[in-house]
Design a protein with these regions (language model features):
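Short amphipathic beta-strand starts and helix->beta connectors
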Residues: 84-85, 129-134, 287-289, 329-333
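Non-catalytic DNA-recognition/assembly elements of restriction-modification systems
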Residues: 1-15, 149-163, 174-219, 346-359, ...
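A short beta-sheet element
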Residues: 30, 56-118, 234, 261-321, ...
Length: 401
C-alpha cells in the first residue's frame, strides 16, 4: 500500500476570485459540476475574474483529480471526486474543492488513483474525515490525504483495471439509454391508447382523484426518537422510478413506537413528493409494494391509497406522471414548492374501460420484462452489477453499479 500524499502531495486549494463583469473571465469548476459517476458536467461552468498571480500550477490538466472539500449532506458524505479530462491549462477549480495531481505518472496511472478514491467514497470511506459545523459538511482534507492508502500494483495492471472499469461504465451508459428508450415507448403507448388526460380528447368518463381514494401526509420524525427501527420512504428514494418493490433496501428511521396503521405503506399505494427545495421533484410519484416489510413514509411525502376498482394502478400511475397532470400539480410555494391534498383533490382523472387499462398494464409488464432481459444480458457479457477488481486486496467495489 502507498500513502496518497506520497503519490499526489497535499491537495492544492482552489480559487474563486470576483464576479466576471467583462465576460472574459476564467472558467472555474464547482461542486455543482460534479456528478455522482465521477465525471465532470461542463454544461454550467461559471467564469470568474481571477487576479491572483502565480497560480499556473492550479490550471487543470488531463488526469487531475478534483476532490470536494465542502458540501455533502447527512445522507451523502463530503469527499466526492471527479476526473478531469478537459482542455489543459483552461479551467481552474473553486475554493470548495481541492486538486490532487499525480507526481509520477510513470509509476501511478492517474485514472487508477482516481478509481481508488472514487470506490473509497462509494464505500463511505470519507465519512470518518467529516467535520460538521452548522449543518455544513467539511472534509478534513489534509488528514484524509495523509492517511488514505492506494493498493500498489504495476503500471500494466493499473491500466488494465481502468480499461475494464471504463468499459463497464460505457456498458452502463448504453443500458441506461436503452432503458430510457423503453420508458419513452411506454409514454408513447399511453398517449396512443388514452390521449392527454387533461385535454381528454377521447372523451372518457372522468372522476376526481380523491373520489377514488384517500390521502395521508407522511410522518415527521425527531432525531432523539429511539426504540423502533423501521424502513422509511423519503424524497431521495424517488429518483426517476415508477415502482419500488423492495422497501427493505430503503434507509431506516428511529421512532419511539411503531407507527399506527395509517402511516404504514401497503401494496399498490402511490406516494407523492409533497415538498422539496427542488421544484422539479415536487409531484413525483411512485407505486410501492412493501409486502410484509413494515415501511413508513416521511413528512415530505403524501400517500394515496386507491379505493375504487374503476382504475388500475399501472394506468393511474402513468396518468399522474404525464406532463400535463404534473403541471396541474405545481404548487405556489416561494422557496419550497408544495403539493397538498387540496391540489390532488382538484385533479380530474379520465376513466377508460377497464379492459383497455388492463391491456396497457400488460404492455407495461412486457416492457419491464425487457428491462430485466437487458440486466441479464449485461451479466452474460461479463459485466455483473457487482464488480470486484482484485490485486493483493480488494481495491474497488462498485456496488452501486
Amino acid at each position: 500500500m502507498a500513502k496518497l500524499i506520497e503519490i499526489t502531495g497535499k491537495a492544492l486549494s482552489g480559487e474563486w476570485g470576483k464576479d466576471d463583469e467583462t465576460g472574459n473571465g476564467v472558467p472555474v469548476l464547482r461542486t455543482t459540476n460534479f456528478t455522482n459517476e465521477g465525471i465532470i458536467d461542463y454544461n454550467s461552468v461559471v467564469t470568474r475574474t481571477i487576479t491572483k498571480k502565480n497560480i499556473g500550477e492550479k490550471f487543470l490538466r488531463k488526469g487531475d483529480i478534483i476532490i470536494e472539500k465542502s458540501g455533502g449532506s447527512d445522507k451523502f458524505p463530503v469527499g466526492r471526486v471527479v476526473y478531469f479530462d478537459g482542455d489543459d491549462n483552461t479551467y481552474l477549480f473553486n475554493n470548495f474543492t481541492g486538486l490532487l495531481r499525480v507526481k509520477e505518472p510513470k509509476m501511478w496511472y492517474p485514472r487508477y488513483v482516481f478509481y481508488s478514491l472514487f470506490a473509497n467514497y462509494k464505500r463511505g470511506g470519507t465519512r470518518m474525515f467529516e467535520n460538521k459545523t452548522t449543518g455544513l459538511h467539511n472534509l478534513k482534507t489534509d488528514d484524509y490525504v495523509s492517511r488514505y492508502e492506494v493498493t500498489e500494483i504495476d503500471m500494466i495492471e493499473q491500466v488494465s483495471v481502468c480499461d475494464k472499469l471504463d468499459k463497464l461504465y460505457e456498458i452502463i451508459n448504453e443500458r441506461k439509454q436503452q432503458l430510457e428508450l423503453l420508458d419513452e415507448l411506454v409514454k408513447a403507448r399511453f398517449v396512443e391508447m388514452f390521449g392527454d388526460p387533461v385535454i381528454n380528447e377521447k372523451e372518457w368518463v372522468t372522476k376526481p382523484l380523491l373520489d377514488m381514494g384517500i390521502c395521508k401526509n407522511g410522518m415527521n420524525f425527531h432525531y432523539n426518537d429511539c426504540g423502533v427501527e423501521i424502513n422509511c420512504l423519503g424524497v431521495g428514494d424517488f429518483k426517476n422510478l415508477s415502482v419500488i418493490d423492495n422497501t427493505e433496501q430503503l434507509s431506516t428511521v428511529s421512532l419511539n413506537e411503531m407507527p399506527s396503521e395509517e402511516y404504514l405503506l401497503k401494496d399498490d399505494d402511490i406516494v407523492f413528493v409533497r415538498s422539496n427545495g427542488n421544484k422539479a421533484l415536487v409531484g413525483r410519484s411512485v407505486a410501492v409494494y412493501p409486502g410484509d416489510i413494515p415501511t413508513t413514509f416521511s413528512g415530505f411525502c403524501i400517500r394515496y391509497r386507491k379505493q375504487d376498482d374503476a382504475v388500475t394502478i399501472p394506468y393511474l400511475l402513468r396518468v399522474l406522471k404525464t406532463d400535463s397532470i404534473r403541471r396541474k400539480m405545481a404548487g405556489r410555494g416561494a422557496n419550497i414548492q408544495n403539493l397538498n391534498q387540496q391540489i390532488l383533490g382538484n385533479l380530474i382523472i379520465p376513466v377508460p374501460p377497464i379492459e383497455l387499462q388492463n391491456q396497457f398494464a400488460d404492455f407495461v409488464k412486457r416492457i419491464d420484462k425487457s428491462k430485466v432481459n437487458y440486466y441479464y444480458k449485461n451479466r452474460k457479457d461479463g459485466f455483473p452489477p457487482l464488480l470486484f477488481i482484485y490485486s493483493v486486496t480488494t481495491i474497488i467495489n462498485l456496488s452501486d453499479y
